[in-house]
Amino acid sequence: MQNKIGLALFGALCYNLTQGLAFTLVRMQANALGDFRTLGLVVGLPNFALVAGSIFWGIIADRWQNRKAVVVLCAMCSSILYIPLPWLGPFGLILIRTLQSFFLGGMVQIATLFSELDPEARATLMGKLEAALGFGWGAGAFLGGFLVISEDYGSSHPTVVFSFLLTASLGVFAVVGYMGSTERYVPREVIKLNFAEYFWPISRLFFTTFIMFLGYMFFLSISPIYLTEVAGSSFGMGIIVLLSGIVHAITAPYIGKLVDNYPREKAIRASTITVFLSLIIYSSTTNIYFVTLAFLPPIYMTYFLGARAIIADNIPYQLRARAMGLLTSFSLLGSGVGSIVVGELLVNMSFQDVFRLGSVLTFIAILVGWYPFKSKI
């Protein structure tokens, strides 16, 4: 069993190396090809495809009763679509990235796989998963900043082409890792359940997710560009993101244990408060040390450890993949709307003004998600 978990973690690490690389490469390429409006569309529109993909693949995973097959299929298709990106203009980049994101929506099912390994330690095991995810994302973003200097973006420069091909290759390694893992099968009585009956008692979790990521994207969607400006180079930006990934990797197992030992809602409160405070810092100073400190906390990881554990605790297995997909959909819907809005706002506003607006939205998320979530089961 430990070997199978290790293979799944290897797949998750490689997959998130691709996500970290894409986080830097796609945003920097889009910004070089156009303006902030182009960047907003390249980041925002694919999020709506991710919404559709996460819902669609969640339903497919429930019907097939095979999460691994969905993850392998989606990882392979999304990896191939990295190959043409360096040769595309703004419209082509938006189009292919949107298509790719439909398949990326199925990757949420790796979290469902881990949530089934040990019901008594769901958050602990998902903490190990998040450690691989956090380090992979941080290391990938660093590679993007290290391999390509900011002046080379906006063209099919050899370093840009190599970086996207490397991203596709790492995606193939992720497929190999996922194929070697084994999904735990537990016989269950096949009964028809009404999803709405289980959704509404914890619906506030989904609305909190939407609002928080709507506000957080007021920074995160443009973070590679902003951090490059603050740090003075894409390499400096990569160092900041790598440090964040290392913090994620080190803290993930401990945060997972805390989520197992304390009410899940505390993770929601902690992450929403932290993202609010980080946006306040971004809007108040451009000091590289303060900006770096604000970027380090594992906000995304902490939020989803708590949220996924709440879903696993309160949604029956037959509906759980759909609920996980819906959670991701709400986060991506907020991210998509936030990214497009930010692209429009930055045409006439400064970074700091945009960050202040984001802090207002995240404060609302704190209020909406503060109280415990009611349970149906």
Where are each of the predicted segments found?
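Helix-loop boundary and gating motifs at the non-cytosolic
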Residues: 1-47, 201-240
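Hydrophobic core of transmembrane alpha-helices in multi-pass small-molecule transporters
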Residues: 13, 91-105, 210, 289-302
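C-terminal transmembrane helical hairpin of 12-TM major facilitator-type secondary transporters
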Residues: 265-305
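Structural signature of the two symmetry-related core transmembrane helices
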Residues: 69-83, 266-281, 359
